[in-house]
């Protein structure tokens, strides 16, 4: 069947390219009720509505968001240029000052990146407006609230960004003027909120915390009660007196004293208390699992030891922080550089400080590098934030252990030694 016959056959039978439907299915980014899966919205299984605002009030969520966002914000971020001599800092590039020091007139680089990560962790997406000069040079970056942004596609399939300001006005921003960093998502365009995806786990944490608060504020259990042998004449008076005397955490464990022949009955439920505490402990680990944060970084030292905390921290840097850094770097490289600059300039975080081990391990590593000739004294001093040694004093010299030689040189040396030994023996015989 020829190409024309094939086309005629498709038109007659109504067949279409099977991939067309796939592309149409992802035309609208999945950030709205009509496009997002049903599990994305609604209350949690514990009956609690989970939003970014309610979730951040849970101490474990706040601690996880804070430790990730502050760690990323504290890492040095710079612009580099790939040259024939290697990769060098491009401190003269306009983006260097924006990313390293001050992205706009209202905030520092630390605050900007901290906000950016908080948006990613709570909403699944980070948006920043790119301000350019008349020469198309980036002169400012301003973070935008993710829950005020609507992302869609126009009739031509191009992405559109519509932002709703605090006074209710809508502003359409061109895609080239938006630094959009998506988190984990299903369509490659929009990220999903970890809070919404894991609403059941977080909702259970909110419910258990609310239960504990209400228990101690309104229903603190006394150590015992007295029962009346007959019908109580004025239940309301007894109830009001009870709440006044034994309600609230300050009155917990007091013995209830009533009159008219009442008998004392101890009241205790240690099993329920233990289960409640276990539930709260489990939810701490569960929420840490969502954000991939070691529990000891949020104050849970139950399973931490002096020998494993360092390795857990390095694991946090490798498996939690680094993926976020790569996601941010690639999004910035795509959105902030011109087509002529891409491939030559790039954005990169410096993770050296985060990956540093204890002092003894660092010194042993430096010694190996120094003795094997692939680090100079100044290379080591730079990593330890110390001033360099002048080059004339050997600060940039590369040294190797004098006992280490090439295998071929060793074989040649042995052959020469054997020759000299034979010559000496012959001379003695001849003498």
Each language-model region and where it sits:
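Structured, contiguous alpha/beta core segments that scaffold functional sites
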Residues: 2-276, 280-289, 293-296, 300, ...
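Short acidic alpha-helical/loop segments enriched in Asp/Glu that coordinate divalent cations
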Residues: 295-305, 330-343
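Small-residue-rich helix-loop
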Residues: 309-310
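Generic long, charged, amphipathic alpha-helical segments
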Residues: 335-357
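Short, amphipathic alpha-helical "recognition" segments used to contact nucleic acids or chromatin
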Residues: 365-370
């Amino acid at each position: 069947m020829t190409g024309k016959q094939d086309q005629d056959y498709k038109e007659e039978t109504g067949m279409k390219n099977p991939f067309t439907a796939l592309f149409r299915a992802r035309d609208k980014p999945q950030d709205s009720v009509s496009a997002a899966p049903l599990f994305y919205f609604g209350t949690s299984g514990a009956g609690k509505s989970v939003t970014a605002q309610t979730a951040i009030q849970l101490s474990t969520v706040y601690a996880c968001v804070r430790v990730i966002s502050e760690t990323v914000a504290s890492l040095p971020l710079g612009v580099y240029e790939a040259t024939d001599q290697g990769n060098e800092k491009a401190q003269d590039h306009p983006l260097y000052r924006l990313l390293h020091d001050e992205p706009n007139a209202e905030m520092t680089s630390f605050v900007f990146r901290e906000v950016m990560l908080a948006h990613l962790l709570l909403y699944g997406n980070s948006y920043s407006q790119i301000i350019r000069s008349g020469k198309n040079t980036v002169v400012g970056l301003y973070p935008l609230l993710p829950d005020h942004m609507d992302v869609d596609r126009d009739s031509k399939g191009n992405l559109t960004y519509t932002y709703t300001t605090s006074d209710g006005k809508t502003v359409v921003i061109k895609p080239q003027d938006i630094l959009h960093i998506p988190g984990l998502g299903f369509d490659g365009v929009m990220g999903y909120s970890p809070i919404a995806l894991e609403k059941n786990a977080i909702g259970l944490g909110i419910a258990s915390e609310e239960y504990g608060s209400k228990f101690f504020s309104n229903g603190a259990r006394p150590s015992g009660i007295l029962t009346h042998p007959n019908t109580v004449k004025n239940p309301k008076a007894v109830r009001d007196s009870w709440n006044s005397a034994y309600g609230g955490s300050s009155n917990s464990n007091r013995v209830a004293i009533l009159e008219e022949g009442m008998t004392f009955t101890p009241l205790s439920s240690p099993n329920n208390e233990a289960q409640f505490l276990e539930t709260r402990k489990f939810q701490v680990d569960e929420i840490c699992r969502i954000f991939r944060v070691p529990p000891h970084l949020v104050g849970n030292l139950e399973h931490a030891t002096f020998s494993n905390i360092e390795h857990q921290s390095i694991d946090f840097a490798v498996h939690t922080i680094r993926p976020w850094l790569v996601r941010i770097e690639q999004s910035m490289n795509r959105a902030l550089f011109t087509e002529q600059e891409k491939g030559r300039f790039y954005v990169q975080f410096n993770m050296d400080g985060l990956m540093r081990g204890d002092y003894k391990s660092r010194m042993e590593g430096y010694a190996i590098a120094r003795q094997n000739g692939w680090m100079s004294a100044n290379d080591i001093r730079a990593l330890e934030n110390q001033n360099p040694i002048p080059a004339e004093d050997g600060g940039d010299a590369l040294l190797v252990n004098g006992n280490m030689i090439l295998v071929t040189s060793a074989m040649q040396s042995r052959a020469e030694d054997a020759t000299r030994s034979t010559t000496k023996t012959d001379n003695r015989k001849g003498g």
